[in-house]
Regions:
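Detector for repetitive beta-architecture
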Residues: 27, 36, 46-48, 56, ...
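Hydrophobic transmembrane alpha-helix bundles
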Residues: 67-69, 100, 119, 195-197, ...
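Intrinsically disordered, low-complexity terminal regions
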Residues: 1-39, 90, 109, 124, ...
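Structural recognition of beta-strand segments within beta-rich domains
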Residues: 50-51, 70
């Protein structure tokens, strides 16, 4: 195992070394992390990285296949957009742990902050302690296991995936409901806990999307061949895809805001108002 000292190297230099060592199949020990941000970001090799202390924001973000073991605490966004691989946090985690993971396994032995598993798509986020508010916020898939209490508004605006809670469910989020837990699901969770040597003998409650707020009054047609007015100027932004998108949104009266699936109504673009402005 090769040692990297963050008391001597910057995070940028350390991450370059981590990726180079990973390409050679070397496991890595990171000492004196001092809660520095972005440790291990971008690693895509099946090696083990041990962080001997606390890590800061977005540790193990944008990684694939690697396994991280963090001895103490971690800041916001641990495992951000992690594809496969794993992260084990021996202490607590800050807000949005497991944000947008796509298959990774993240285990937090302490408590975790708000909006855990936000927009996650696949994989498992497990918290041995308690969660803060809105765990599973807008999650699209995967599962969250909380062996402590859920925190308020668990499952807020989730569209898919499952949340399992052993402790108290403080309150359900918008469009979330509690449902029955199948025996196969229960067994699969216990096998996962055994894999990470987590002792658990209690029972679990299952939370899923209720399916009451996933429909708009007017559906957006999935059609590619849509006429639109062309733009004669010289602009890289005003391309055919943008024009098509604006045409679709003008028909349904709703335009998506980039980031986390938000939407807002289009303003009224009446002819009279346009003429008035021209005058």
């Amino acid at each position: 195992m090769v040692q990297i000292d963050l008391a001597k190297d910057s995070v940028r230099e350390a991450n370059e070394k981590i990726r180079e060592l990973g390409a050679k199949g070397e496991d890595i020990d990171v000492i004196n992390p001092d809660a520095r941000h972005h440790i291990g970001v971008g690693l895509t090799e099946a090696v083990t990285v041990r962080v001997r202390g606390s890590a800061g924001y977005f540790c193990a973000g944008l990684t694939d296949k690697a396994n991280f073991d963090i001895e103490a605490n971690v800041g916001w966004g641990v495992g951000d957009n992690m594809y496969t691989g794993s992260v084990v946090v021996r202490g607590n985690a800050g807000a949005i742990p497991g944000v947008a993971i796509r298959g990774a396994e993240i285990v937090i032995h302490g408590n975790m902050g708000s909006r855990a598993g936000q927009v996650m798509k696949e994989g498992t986020l497990c918290c041995v302690g308690n969660a803060n508010f809105m765990a599973g916020y807008m999650m699209y898939g995967g599962r969250i296991i909380i062996l402590g209490d859920s925190g308020e508004r668990v499952g807020e605006d989730m569209s898919a995936g499952e949340i399992f809670v052993a402790g108290d469910v403080a309150s359900l989020g918008s469009d979330a409901k509690q449902t029955d837990l199948g025996s196969e699901e229960d067994q699969d969770i216990r096998e996962f806990l055994d894999k990470y040597k987590i002792n658990f003998s209690g029972s679990l409650k299952k939370i899923v999307n209720a399916g009451t707020k996933l429909r708009y009054a007017k559906s957006e047609e999935q059609v590619r061949s849509i006429p639109f007015f062309t733009f004669s100027g010289n602009s890289e932004y005003w391309n055919p895809k943008i024009q098509e998108d604006i045409h679709i949104k003008s028909q349904i009266g709703r335009y998506r805001v980039r980031g986390y699936g938000g939407a807002r109504p289009l303003p009224h673009l009446g002819v009279g108002r346009a003429v008035g402005r021209a005058q």
